[in-house]
Amino acid sequence: MASSIPNAPSAFNSQSYVGLRAPLRTFNFSSPQAAKIPRSQRLFVVRASDSEFEAAVVAGKVPPAPPVRPRPAAPVGTPVVPSLPLHRRPRRNRKSPALRSAFQETSISPANFVYPLFIHEGEEDTPIGAMPGCYRLGWRHGLVEEVAKARDVGVNSVVLFPKIPDALKSPTGDEAYNENGLVPRTIRLLKDKYPDLVIYTDVALDPYSSDGHDGIVREDGVIMNDETVHQLCKQAVAQAQAGADVVSPSDMMDGRVGALRAALDAEGFQHVSIMSYTAKYASSFYGPFREALDSNPRFGDKKTYQMNPANYREALTEMREDESEGADILLVKPGLPYLDIIRLLRDNSPLPIAAYQVSGEYAMIKAAGALKMIDEEKVMMESLMCLRRAGADIILTYSALQAARCLCGEKR
């Protein structure tokens, strides 16, 4: 068949088209525009059958193709050396973007992120000085808008951290299980607005404690374990009643996972998951977070219940206890400085592993980026990929929105 293409050279001879012309009669498919062009200026494209093309190639009438590319020249002065006798050259699998993408072992997507959000009772969104780009969000408006932005780029999981008024804090943290407290109210609001949003909650007393510790403090400064766990169970049940999908005990009290599982099941919340802070270290990387919630301990530190940063094998003990007590997800905190612990849990547990890229990690990247010492966006994405490579299935990160926008091709 033939079709007309306008503006062809008038001297074109269709009979010389690669030496081929279909023996059958041809058709000229003319458009109204082509009809106005003189026949002598039309190009007739003649197509032969596959067998005719093959016969032409066999006869030596090979269609033209681009020539072999010359080898790129080396810089002047480059020594001429014999090729190394290498059986394997790993660089061959890295020589092009397509090959690098094909052989990439670790991937990351917005679905891997859990977005930590700070909330407070006010209407204004208050910037957090030590965490550029993060705010204490008004629970009724700012929070809803931030969640909408995250969902637009594929982040559909959030974890809530409340700033509680000092007047509501107490030594026993009773506000933690107030069914009409800030967190339960916020959960109900978000579930009403976004029913499919996955809401994680923090289970610990430090935001509600007048002492700033994760548990009840005895007069001699000892953090009371079992009494604290009793309070945490009531807190988790209140969160589940409001609609929480995953409760996350970050307190590091012994036995709290099993107690929470029993309390939730007894109230009919068998479907609510537990993400245990399995290996939460007594780290110096938490400073900006405590500023955000005004939850610094009023005295002492948290070393009697959080793990020693020098310890590795202890994480296995915590992991086995949490598994046996019914944890659904195991979390390591902090993240990047503890990649070895993430890998340790990944290699020894079939459960999903979470990593928390904490406030100090976030602040360092932001500060260095602001000073133009690093490419903030590239370092941020590399740090998240490293957490995934180490074995984290999900990552709690304050960069969730920014990183998801990068993955979606949006500008910051």
UniProtKB/Swiss-Prot annotation:
Residues given in the record as 5-aminolevulinate 2 binding sites: S359, Y398
Cited SMART domains: ALAD
Family: Belongs to the ALAD family.
Domain of life, per lineage: Eukaryota
Range of the transit peptide: 1-48
BP-aspect Gene Ontology terms: chlorophyll biosynthetic process; heme biosynthetic process; protoporphyrinogen IX biosynthetic process
Residues the record lists as binding Mg(2+): E318
List of residues binding 5-aminolevulinate 1: R290, K302
Protein name as annotated: Delta-aminolevulinic acid dehydratase, chloroplastic
Gene Ontology CC terms, in alphabetical order: chloroplast; cytosol
Keywords for the protein's UniProt record, in alphabetical order: Allosteric enzyme, Chlorophyll biosynthesis, Chloroplast, Heme biosynthesis, Lyase, Magnesium, Metal-binding, Plastid, Porphyrin biosynthesis, Transit peptide
Its biological purpose: Is committed to plant tetrapyrrole synthesis.
Disulphide linkage map: none
Molecular function (Gene Ontology), one example: porphobilinogen synthase activity
